[in-house]
């Protein structure tokens, strides 16, 4: 039997049949600077609770897989400098080596499914990197979506990626991407990508119904619920694209590769947008947590 350490709040939720929403920990250790990372982690948990669900931030601590963190553990991840960034492939190593590890989308999905959590809120999924024809840099998040039965509530894929190619790979893996109040794929910082989805839901009940039906007939894959960033914080697509171009040039000049690419680009985006990207990231994370809680509650009520 897989050993998971459930926080008391999460244990109680399972025992009482309450809805639970998974949250990742990479945003704490690798996504945002301190103390902003700690504040957003606590805010996301508060948002999930306010929406009627129980938050379960997932991480590996000294080789033990935790589903739900204390405030002290969140503080540790916000300040520690030796935290591994974990995809699915890295979980076993971190456990065996007794290391601390922050979970990416892929690792969070894998552990959430083991724990029996159906809904997961994050900022944006990984995908096919620009220039992947040369580098073969494709996020493990996409493969995980193809095999883990978890609903991922996000603002689409991160806009630093090749969004059309990312959609193609998700289609290949049998992963539906459903727009929430939109028929267009959000581009993380921007509401518009120009990529039509052809699948739309307009409220938590519809989203829960779509997910429940996919669970029955989708062959075990996950689903992406793509939520546009809040209108008041969404950035102009042309402004974002120009900043991305400069950030990618910096990454190439610095020889950044592999798992370090996304954190580097997000940090460069913050500099290039003079902090606007961080404000948008924070707003969409909170918005996604709110939607995820509402969908989790709707799922619970439909049972």
From Swiss-Prot:
Keywords: Glycosidase, Hydrolase, Lyase, Manganese, Metal-binding. GO terms for molecular function: hydrolase activity, acting on glycosyl bonds; metal ion binding; pseudouridylate synthase activity. The keyword Transferase does not apply. GO terms for biological process: nucleobase catabolic process. InterPro entries: Indigdn_synthA-like, PsuG. Its EC number is 4.2.1.70. The active site is at residues 24, 158. Substrate binds at residues 85, 105, 139-141. It is an enzyme of class 4 (lyase). It catalyses: D-ribose 5-phosphate + uracil = psi-UMP + H2O. Pfam families: Indigoidine_A (PF04227). Mn(2+) binds at residue 137. Binds 1 Mn(2+) ion per subunit. One of its GO terms (cellular component) is cytoplasm. Its cofactor is Mn(2+). Homotrimer. HAMAP family: PsiMP_glycosidase. Belongs to the pseudouridine-5'-phosphate glycosidase family. Catalyzes the reversible cleavage of pseudouridine 5'-phosphate (PsiMP) to ribose 5-phosphate and uracil. Functions biologically in the cleavage direction, as part of a pseudouridine degradation pathway. This is Pseudouridine-5'-phosphate glycosidase. It comes from Herpetosiphon aurantiacus (strain ATCC 23779 / DSM 785 / 114-95). The gene is psuG.
């Amino acid at each position: 039997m897989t050993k998971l350490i459930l926080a008391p709040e999460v244990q109680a939720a399972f025992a009482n049949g309450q809805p639970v929403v998974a949250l990742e920990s990479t945003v704490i250790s690798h996504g945002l600077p301190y103390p902003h990372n700690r504040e957003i982690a606590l805010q996301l948990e508060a948002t999930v609770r306010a929406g009627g669900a129980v938050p379960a931030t997932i991480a590996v601590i000294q080789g033990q897989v935790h589903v739900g963190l204390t405030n002290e553990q969140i503080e540790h991840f916000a300040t520690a400098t030796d935290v591994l960034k974990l995809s699915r492939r890295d979980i076993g190593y971190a456990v065996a080596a007794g290391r601390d590890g922050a979970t990416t989308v892929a690792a969070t999905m894998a552990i959430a499914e083991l724990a029996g959590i159906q809904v997961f809120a994050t900022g944006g999924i990984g995908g096919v990197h620009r220039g992947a024809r040369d580098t073969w840099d494709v996020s493990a998040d996409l493969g995980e979506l193809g095999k883990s039965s978890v609903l991922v509530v996000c603002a689409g894929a991160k806009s630093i990626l090749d969004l059309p190619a990312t959609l193609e790979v998700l289609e290949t893996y049998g992963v539906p991407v459903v727009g929430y109040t939109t028929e267009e794929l959000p581009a993380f910082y921007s509401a518009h990508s120009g990529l039509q989805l052809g699948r739309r839901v307009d409220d938590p009940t519809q989203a829960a119904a779509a997910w429940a039906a996919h669970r029955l007939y989708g062959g075990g894959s996950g689903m992406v619920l793509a939520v546009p960033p809040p209108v008041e914080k969404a950035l102009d697509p042309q402004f974002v694209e120009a900043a991305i171009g400069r950030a990618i040039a910096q990454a190439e000049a610095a020889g950044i590769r592999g798992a370090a690419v996304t954190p580097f680009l997000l940090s460069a985006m913050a500099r290039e947008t003079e902090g606007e990207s961080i404000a948008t990231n924070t707003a969409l994370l909170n918005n996604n947590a709110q939607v995820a809680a509402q969908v989790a509650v709707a799922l619970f009520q439909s049972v």
